[in-house]
Amino acid sequence: MKKYVCTVCGYEYDPAEGDPDNGVKPGTSFDDLPADWVCPVCGAPKSEFEAA
């Protein structure tokens, strides 16, 4: 699975790790993240992420 990077702050979403602090289990692909998921660092929406 591809990693995605926030173009605002540089946070990298790694599907292998997920975002457990925000209820996203490891193994969750970027495309499967909830529509209202935001960058856990800066709050940017999914639309501000690009493939790493």
UniProtKB/Swiss-Prot annotation:
It is found in: Cytoplasm. The lineage of its organism: Bacteria, Pseudomonadati, Thermodesulfobacteriota, Desulfovibrionia, Desulfovibrionales. It comes from Nitratidesulfovibrio vulgaris (strain ATCC 29579 / DSM 644 / CCUG 34227 / NCIMB 8303 / VKM B-1760 / Hildenborough). Residues 1-52 form the Rubredoxin-like domain. This is Rubredoxin. Signal peptide: none annotated. NCBIfam families: RubredRD. InterPro entries: Rubredoxin, Rubredoxin-like_dom, Rubredoxin_dom, Rubredoxin_ET, Rubredoxin_Fe_BS. Its cofactor is Fe(3+). Binds 1 Fe(3+) ion per subunit. Belongs to the rubredoxin family. GO terms for molecular function: electron transfer activity; iron ion binding. GO terms for cellular component: cytoplasm. The keyword Protease does not apply. It comes from the Bacteria.
